[in-house]
Every structure is written in C-alpha cells, then in structure tokens.
Amino acid sequence: MKTSKLNFLTLVASTGLALAFLSGCTSNTGTTQSAKLYSEEELGLRKATIYNENKTLVKEFEYSKEPAGASKVYERSFENAPPMIPHDVEGMMDMSREINMCTSCHLPEVAEAAAATPMPKSHFFNMRTGEDLKGAMDEARYNCSQCHTPQANVTPLVDNRFRPEFRGEDAKNRSNLIDTLNEGVK
C-alpha cells in the first residue's frame, strides 16, 4: 500500500513538472517576435502553387546552337567535374551501347582532330572491378548525358557564390580522376 501511494505521488509530481515546463515553452508573454508566415505560392523558386502546373510559367530558354567543334569550352565547376556540353546536341542524344554520337568525336584517338575534349582514362576503366579495359570504353559510360548536360542560355534564379579551387591550370579543362581517385584513402 505504501509503495502504490509513493508511485501515485511521484506520478502526480512529475506530471505537474511536465505541465509547468510545457506551459513555459508555449507562453506568448515577453518580447518574442512572431515568425513570418509564407503562403504555398511563395515557397520554392517557381512562385506558384505546388498542387498543379496550370499557373506555372517557365521562362523561354534555348540550348546552344553552336556546332560541335566551334563552341567555347566551359571551365569545370570543380576539379574533376564532368564537363558540360557547350554545343548543339540536336539528334545526338539517342544513345545505346551500339550507337553513340559522342564517341565519334570524343574518343581519345579522334578528339584532337575533331577539336573535342578527349574522354579521360576513367572512362576506360571498370570502377567496380578495378580492371583497366585497355582502351575499350566501360559499358557503364555509354549514357553520356547521365553526367554531361547541354547548357541553356538562362539567367540563374539564385546567385552562385561558389568559386572552385583547382590544384593546377589543366584541371580547369581536363580530368585526372583515375590518378587521384584514391587520394587520402590508402
């Protein structure tokens, strides 16, 4: 009987403390500022409802129309980043293991003659098995647009203040990922 009375008193006391604590946390007294509430239309970059696409306005944009070989090469976003596609890609993006228009200019043996960026050594190496494929392109690399994307002529919605740091001048336009992949690991 004594134990159950003690348990009951402990329960009442702890409940009272919990209620006092919670009421202090939710009190509106004092000099607290109220948070600004945002409507659903103000959320995100689109400034439109998130429930349907009826009022979503997409600004007109165009991809580069410069032909391959005549376009400027973009500096990479960071060291060993996949290079962006600076040229027109009309008719080039239907890719399969058997047909890939990108390789007709970007394979190392033809890249210089085509004035194209050559595919790096990492594309001729199986990252899963660690096997050097001796000049054969890794089958995991045939879908070029998985990493490389054409650039549209648009104004960024958000200012990008990121400034990359490259360890060498050539890293701005070339990849040495296969040579640096295990840095700091071993």
UniProtKB/Swiss-Prot annotation:
Keywords noted in UniProt: Electron transport, Heme, Iron, Metal-binding, Periplasm, Signal, Transport
Family matches, as PROSITE patterns: MULTIHEME_CYTC (PS51008), PROKAR_LIPOPROTEIN (PS51257)
Biological processes per GO annotation: anaerobic respiration
Residues that, per the record, bind heme c 2: H123, C144, C147, H148
Post-translational modification, as annotated: Binds 2 heme C groups per subunit.
InterPro entries per the UniProt record, alphabetical: Multihaem_cyt_sf, NapB
Subcellular location: Periplasm
Disruption phenotype: Mutants fail to grow by nitrate respiration and also fail to reduce nitrate and contain increased amounts of NapA.
Signal peptide: 1-20
Pfam families reported in the protein's UniProt record: NapB (PF03892)
GO molecular function: metal ion binding
Positions of heme c 1 binding: H87, C102, C105, H106
Any Gene Ontology CC annotation: periplasmic space
Family indicated by similarity: Belongs to the NapB family.
Summary of the function given for this chain in its UniProt record: Electron transfer subunit of the periplasmic nitrate reductase complex NapAB. Transfers electrons to NapA subunit, thus allowing electron flow between membrane and periplasm. Essential for periplasmic nitrate reduction with nitrate as the terminal electron acceptor.
Subunit structure: Component of the periplasmic nitrate reductase NapAB complex composed of NapA and NapB.
Protein name: Periplasmic nitrate reductase, electron transfer subunit
Organism of provenance: Wolinella succinogenes (strain ATCC 29543 / DSM 1740 / CCUG 13145 / JCM 31913 / LMG 7466 / NCTC 11488 / FDC 602W) (Vibrio succinogenes)
